[in-house]
Amino acid sequence: MNYHRRLHPGRCGNGKGGLVNIDCSGNRVAGMIFGPKRVIVVAGANKLVDDLDEAVKRLRRIAPLNARRIKHHTPCVETGKCMDCQVQQRLCNYLTVINHGMKFPGRITVVMVGEETGF
């Protein structure tokens, strides 16, 4: 979970919030986008950023740490920064942005924890 402060149905594009994710296989983001009737996202304050550009920068800065944690063999593990690699174990295959949930109001609930959680 990343950019902006809140996810408000019907307020897309006015700086009220959204969810930005990068995923390796798409299995985590797929369930957020379509599937269950309710989605609850719990995230720490360290995941909040000011805008979409900052969200993507943050994800690319964090991805090498996560790749190292799960023992993927990618260039970013070696260099410590995103190399926009084209290898099979790449973590950054799917970038999703959920701007709002107008189609299904109340389906996504974001619970913010007032401390740092994970990467």
Task: Give the ranges of each region predicted by the language model.
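Conserved phosphate- and dinucleotide-binding cores of soluble alpha/beta proteins
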Residues: 2-119
